[in-house]
Amino acid sequence: MSTQLVKIGTWGGNGGGRVDLSVLPRSLKSVTIRSGAAIDAIAFTYIGTDGKEHLAGPWGGGGGNPTTITLGSQEFVKGISGTFTNVVTNLKIVTNVTTYNFGQGGGTAFSLPLQSGSVVGFFGRAGALVDSIGVYVHI
């Protein structure tokens, strides 16, 4: 079965600088989020289309508390949701096992539940905080 990689999003503001991947993702291994009142930063490890492990980020600032999600061998991200103002204020990462919740929220809601496929990477805009976020999805 062949898969297709698509970019979906972004949700958030226009501040900060553009952040994206130089090697396209094939699978997501772990995600580290720094958060407090908002999403301060995101970093993640992934296996690229070149077959190698890559680290993206951290994108954003050094505030907030860091939390790392290490995906299990059979765990995958089946959706994201959250809220934003001019920055991302809340991010929920939904896997086939559990839901991880970051930031305090407020603003406009967004949601991307996937009926099939999985989130394999992120892109967006970042400066002192994560200004906007989008996802790479294998469908």
Curated annotation (Swiss-Prot):
Jacalin-type lectin domain residues: 5-139
Keyword flag Hydrolase: no
Organismal lineage: Eukaryota, Viridiplantae, Streptophyta, Embryophyta, Tracheophyta
CDD domains membership: Jacalin (cd09612)
Pfam families xrefs: Jacalin (PF01419)
Entry superkingdom: Eukaryota
Gene3D superfamilies in the cross-refs: Jacalin-like lectin domain
Signal peptide: none
InterPro entries with a match to the protein in the record: Jacalin-like_lectin_dom, Jacalin-like_lectin_dom_plant, Jacalin-like_lectin_dom_sf
This protein's name: Protein GOS9
PROSITE patterns the UniProt entry points to: JACALIN_LECTIN (PS51752)
Tissue: Expressed mainly in roots.
Zinc-finger in keyword set: no
Gene Ontology MF annotations: carbohydrate binding
Keywords annotated in UniProt: Lectin
Gene coding for it: GOS9
